[in-house]
Amino acid sequence: MEVIVEGKVKTVYQGDDAQQVIIEYHDKVTAGNGEMVDHPLGKGSLCCSISSIIFEKLAKEHIPTHYINMVGANKMICKKVDIVPLEVICRNRAAGSIVRETTLAEGTPLPHPIVEFFLKDDSKHDPLLTPDRVRLMGYDPDPFIEMTLRINDYLRQMFYIMGIDLVDFKVEYGYDAHGDLYLADEISPDSMRLWKIGSDERFDKDLFRNDEGDIVPAYREILDRLQPLAIQ
């Protein structure tokens, strides 16, 4: 298969259909712009399965996603889109960079969900962008904000039912050949912070990032909690 993009933890191939791609999830985890690397067995299939369930749930809420279906344990067929070079972060609690860069303590509930933009460029260390800078890049930030908040509303309720607090998450978007906007990339514990309600237990990549434990059992726990919801 023709490789379109070789990412840190995923490879994107051209599909048989010119308007489709195949995304392969690898048993690999990175942090610190690739400075930390590990290869946890089974991690790729877990992220692929979790993403597929979440994409399907969001599609039922009329949120357009690039996802079509899974093929095998760690691959999915997706609609081909041109990825926007932005990482869009939605925050419900203070964690990560917002703690490092403000006076907020980790875990502080935010008065309302905050949507932030970061340039998708490792060489520049993914700098924070203002909405005006997003506009200067040629993109209207409002559709990204609106869709991200819709995603947050749904996922926050879904994870609450699972006993999980959705602290924050990252999404990426792309435009198809007709100029329509789609949620793309993935939504998995690699791109979310998930804390067990009422405890300090975590189910996300911070376990690896902060050397606090094995991510595979944590990701498997998220998949186990998601699967009963997948059939609803």
Residues covered by each model-derived region:
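Conserved metal-phosphate-binding beta-hairpin within the catalytic cores
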Residues: 90, 166-185
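Short histidine-centered catalytic/ligand-binding loop motif
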Residues: 35-45, 122-147
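Short connector loops/turns at beta-strand edges and beta->alpha or beta->beta junctions
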Residues: 27-30, 123-124, 189
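C-terminal helix-cap and adjacent tail motif
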Residues: 108, 187-232
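A short glycine-rich, hydrophobically flanked beta-strand micro-motif that places a catalytic Asp/Glu
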Residues: 68-74, 161-175
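A long amphipathic alpha-helix within ATP-dependent nucleotide-binding catalytic cores
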Residues: 136-167
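Short beta-strand elements
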Residues: 25-26, 92, 182-189
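Active-site loop/lid in soluble adenylation, ligation, and acyl-transfer enzymes
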Residues: 1-119, 226, 230
